[in-house]
Amino acid sequence: MTSDIFFDPIWDVRMTDTSLRDGSHHKRHQFTKDEVGAIVAALDTAGVPVIEVTHGDGLGGSSFNYGFSKTPEQELIKLAAETAKEAKIAFLMLPGVGTKEDIKEAQNNGGSICRIATHCTEADVSIQHFGLARELGLETVGFLMMSHTIPPEKLAQQARIMADAGCQCVYVVDSAGALVLEGVRDRVAALVAELGDDAQVGFHGHENLGLGVANSVEAVRAGAKQIDGSCRRFGAGAGNAPVEALIGVFDKIGVKTGIDFFDIADAAEEVVAPAMPAECLLDRNALIMGYSGVYSSFLKHAIRQSERYGVPAHQLLHRAGQRKLIGGQEDQLIDIALEIKREMESDAAGRQSHAIGGSPRKG
């Protein structure tokens, strides 16, 4: 099933740039056509083989819950496909958010790689979507999100479900940036052992603990054949592994990608950076997400609720991790914010009462 994957024989690894999908979280889904056209052209020139374009939460993600897109994603997919001369355009879809009709429309607009994402314990909800994508002649990729939350052997079982449904490459997806080196290696190795020649294995990392590049190297050494990254770390949380750094490292250790290091460095500096609202930072909030295992796209939602209710964003994120919230449960941040606000008000009232009453006098 891997024989018809878009994979040049000269590559050791196929890179996918997710700046125009994962980066949508950081940009609050406000990409313009000019920005997308310029970024696709620069990435294509640098030799990036696959460019992912969609709302941050995939097809159909433009909504009150996830955030509305400035420009309809299908228009951006079409523009990207028309702009790229060599690169293939990928799109993400989450069952329950996107629909089968969205997949068909994305293909009609020039998308050729369908990436279907589920929580890492729910691969079964993707079966019909993989079936449709293969019927349509699309290349398929599966995302097992929040892969840090279950052990390697169980993750491999979920990967088998996707592969049997028609998935040609199953990704270990470190949505929270919580995995550390051997955690990546063990999970990728487990999937490679389970899937064999039935499907490739990929890795998607985040920088919330500063390990996006190192974890990607571990993944390749464990047998991963597809790796994600975003120029300038343009992604959710502290961002994704920076493609330009990945290419520099891969060049040094002899991993062939077909991407020119200097061209991708130019693209990151001169084209992608100007489109970013700010740099993706490894700050306290991002660190808390990596440390506590919080889905990276929660960052902007937590900041918004922090400002709305006057509570610390990092406390919101830590409690989200304690409650093991997953993608799609962003609305629960409101409940947590109200809970923290009540606690803060109760503590303040207690301190005021103590100050008024003073300390009892000794007789």
UniProtKB/Swiss-Prot annotation:
The active site is at H25. Residues 13-265 form the Pyruvate carboxyltransferase domain. GO terms for biological process: catabolic process; L-leucine biosynthetic process. Mn(2+) binds at D22, H204, H206. Keywords: Aromatic hydrocarbons catabolism, Lyase, Manganese, Metal-binding. Its EC number is 4.1.3.39. It catalyses: (S)-4-hydroxy-2-oxopentanoate = acetaldehyde + pyruvate. Substrate binds at R21, D22, S175, H204, Y295. One of its GO terms (molecular function) is manganese ion binding. Transmembrane segments: none annotated. The keyword Metal-binding applies. PROSITE patterns: PYR_CT. The record marks R21 as: Transition state stabilizer. It is an enzyme of class 4 (lyase). Belongs to the 4-hydroxy-2-oxovalerate aldolase family. NCBIfam families: 4OH_2_O_val_ald (TIGR03217), PRK08195.1 (NF006049). This is 4-hydroxy-2-oxovalerate aldolase 1. It comes from Mycobacterium sp. (strain JLS).
